[in-house]
Amino acid sequence: DVCPNKSRACFTFCLDNAGRGRFDHVKLARLVKTKRYRLDPAKFTREVSQELARKVKWWSSNRPAWQLVLRADGTSDIGIGRRICHDHPSVQFMDYTKHLQVIRRDCKIPYGSNYHLTFSWSGENEQECREALDLGYNVAAPFLPNTKSGAWHPPEFMGYPVISGENDDLRFL
């Protein structure tokens, strides 16, 4: 399991089944990558870093004005981005986690100036979400549209303003 803090509530809204993630070929590719990671985490991480280095080279040649952004843990919580962000200072890393200890550690000793963390709501971790918010981190939480107003999200959640992630989730900006 690459997302050990998942809950029944968050499974309903998981990115694993959203958009392209719901297609069999995408699920199979993720499964193959997970198996490769489990067999040799160090080798897999090295290969991801090498692939990213090739992408950085291509982007710097073909799209020099664009910022390359990597969300390594979109559907997992294994922390590859945390391990390779220092090797790729020109890349902006963004990750999601349900591990409060990862947030606490980043708060004390940041993983990198090019690494941004967002804490994920699971439906069962309100206390942890409050702590992450109080520490200055964003919390990602899914909302169903209000059947009366049609609004996709409330104006506030846990006393903090809600910013819609419908257009983008570039919280580091």
Label each region the model flagged:
Residues 1-173:
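Class I S-adenosyl-L-methionine
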